[in-house]
Each structure stands twice: as C-alpha cells, then as structure tokens.
Amino acid sequence: MPPTISDDTTVRSFTCAQPLGRAGYELIIRQMLHRFLSDLHTTKALLDRSLQATVNHAAGPVRSLLTIITVGFYTLLNWCSLGSYHTTKMISTVVTGLLLLASGCEALPTNQTPLPGKWSTLPNITLNGVEYPRQEHAAALVGDEIFVLGGILPWDGKEYATTNIVQKYNMITGTWTETAPMPAALNHANVAVVDGKIYYLGGLEAVDETYWNATGKSAVYDPATDEWTVLPSMPEGREIGSAATVVVDDTIYLPGGLAYTNITYDQEGTVSRFSSYNVRTQEWTTLPDLPAPRDHAGKGIYRDMLYILGGREFGNKNVVSTVFGFNLTSQQWATAFEPMPIARGGVASATIGSLIFTAGGEGDRRTPTAVFPEMQAYDAATNTWVDYADMPLPVHGSDAVVYKGEIVIPGGGIVTGATLTPVVQTFQPPLPDSGEKSMPLMVMVYRVVFDLPWMLFKR
C-alpha cells in the first residue's frame, strides 16, 4: 500500500524534518538501484520512506502532482510483484530518484541549525572491481590502509553466507585490493590491532543457514607478509562474538558479546562475561563480569577507563542506553555515567581524544527500517553527550576506524536485520571553536595540555 500522504511521519532518517541533503538522497538512490534487481521487499521499504519524504515536503499543486505520481508508482510496484519486472523496477527507480532530487528536501527548515560535522564518502567496497556489500564485519587500520574482515554477504535465496574474505582500502592510492583470507569464516569477529598486526579472537560462525554460534578460533595477520598465523583458541566456555573489543598496550579486552544468534526465531544469547588476552605472553585472563549482559555495544578507552555504551540485551529490539565503565587500575565496574540520549545497538564507534563517537545502529522504532541516523559522542572528560550531523545513509552492523582525525565507516546494513551496503562513509568532526582547523592538530593540543600531565603523574 502507498504511504499515508497526509501523515507527517516522525521518521528522522527519511523525512525532511531531518533532511538528508542531496548527498544522502544520492546514496539512497544508489542503494535502491543496487537492491532493485535482488530484493523487491527491501526496495519497497526504502522507497516507502523516500517517497513519503518527498510528498510530505511538497505543497500545493506540487503536492497533488507528487500524490498522483506516488499512487502510479505503487501501481507499477504492485505489477512488479506479479511476474518478470526488471524493466519496470528500473523505470520506477529512476522516476523516484528524479523526484527526490527535484523536491527540495535537501533544504533545512528555517528554524533549524545544522548540527556540526561533515560527512563524505570513499569509493565503495569492491572485490575484483565489483561492488561487494558487507555487514557484521570488522574494520582495522594499519598505517594508511583500512581492512574489512569477514562478515556476511547478501542473501542468496537461502542464507546470509558468512565469509572469510579480507579486503583493504589504501587511503593514499584510493584503491581496494583483496588480501589473504582469514583462516576461519566469521561474522561479528572480535578484532584488534596491536603493533601493526591484526588479531581476531573469536566471533560467530555459521552452523546452518540461520544459526550462528560463538567460536574461540583465533589468529593474527601480518600486513607486511600478507600471512595469517593461527593462535590457540579462546579458553573453553569463554567463546564470544560481537564483544566490545578494545586495546590497551599489549592487552586486548573483550567485554560482553554473543554466545549465539538464531535468526529464524530472533533469539540471541547475550553474555556478561569479560576476558582479556595479552599478545606478548599469549595468556588469557578472566575479569569481573559486566553489570548486565551486553552485545553490539559501542566502546572506547579514555585514560584508565574502558567504556561500554548502549548495545542490546537478548535481541535487536531490546536496545539499551546505559553506559558502563571498567576501571583498568582498580579492576572494578561503575555505572554512574550519563546514558545515551537515544538507546541504540549495533553502532559503529570510534574514539578521538575524550570523545567516543557512536554512529547509526538499529532498534529505531520511529521508522520501519529501524536504523538510526544519529551520530553522537560521549565526552568522557565531562560525562556529557554531544550531537553531531546525522549519517547521510543510516547503517548498523558496521565498524569504524579513525584515520588522521577522520572517522571511516565501511559498509553495514541499511534495514534492521541484514540488508547490506558497499557504501563507505566518512565523518570529519569539527573543532569546538573553529571548523577551519584540522582535527589532528586539535587532538595533539588536547593531549599535550590534558593527557600528557596525567600520564606523567600516573607513572
């Protein structure tokens, strides 16, 4: 059915109440073109939101015209459902794209101040020159190269296949290349970088088409030789995927995560267990459990505190806003932190200075896509949250790295569950007082003024 034309929807990510801008709509249109030839149901959901944004924004004769076109479009879409529909789908997509770009939805309401920060894109994830959507993968930065590891592939009519493929994007040359595959095919892998080497310590592997189980399989990758070395598995009973993985010196911390995921019955085994692995000694340590089970949470380190932000508890509908902190010195958990402004799970998180950024995520009940557009940061120095510009293309199930002060988020899902995109989005946070200065300079000044004295005092 067509959307209710008179309904001023509250969906932020696909309405002009929170405009996406021309770049955002171009991303949506590109995604619609990609999805049309493989998944009509998902495409209809995307176009529902996009068309509703167009119609809600228009007025007078333009509104009437768009209403007629909308009804006509849905008639075409219904015809599409009856048989062979490739040509009709493509025509419908082009018409929708023209409507979106011509409707003026990119203009901000006169009473709204743009949120800070600048979004952009890098070349889409590709494999042998072909776009290669990815979700529930891990990302890692080594030097000038961003690695995308494992994850799931688009629906093939039977399952979301888990892959061991690894690709890297060179920020200098602007090219994607394939590297040596992971020894195990994993999604929700727990990945960290220590001394220029990439570690994965467990993750989820497919048992059958719709059931993923945690595994303790582990390995380390050396970019210099393009070789993987298999490591001893995680201790029995400590296997997890989707942990809030962070690194401090030689130690990789893995708080929370998933023991399993049953896609058919929407069941997830969220855990509160907490382990760490020292890459020098190759020893595992059991740490105090989290205050509550968490998976798909944001994470970050500031000074001697490990933060767990939001996430979910036993299912993607059960998102939470709590912020936990683990003191690495006292080895104790604390919970008295300002919660997330919006409960979210499946966010991509990255830390710059005292700011822990959380982008996207799923569990948004304001929209049928259930994917959040918000970019918000927790300031660990002040225990406050800061709002930034929304994502042009809201995603969940992705990961993030920081390259020279810019946050890079490759791929992810654009509809709750699994609807993959190859789009790579980047976010440049502004300086509080001047958007003209570079982020790396701000970080350097901040660390000299605040962090260096603290580090010297700690020693």
Swiss-Prot record:
Induction: Expression is under the control of the terrein cluster-specific transcription factor terR. Terrein shows anticancer activity on various tumors including cervical carcinoma, ovarian cancer, and head and neck cancer. The secondary metabolite acts as angiogenesis inhibitors through the inhibition of angiogenin secretion. Terrein also has anti-inflammatory activity. It shows an alleviative function of age-related inflammation characterized as an anti-oxidant and might therefore be a useful nutraceutical compound for anti-aging. Terrein may enhance osseointegration by decreasing the level of ROS and has a potentially synergistic effect on osteoblast differentiation. Kelch repeats lie at residues 92-144, 145-196, 198-248, 251-304, 306-354, 355-405. Keywords: Kelch repeat, Repeat. Pfam families: Beta-prop_ATRN-LZTR1. Pathway: Secondary metabolite biosynthesis. Disruption phenotype: Impairs the production of terrein. This is Kelch-like protein terF.
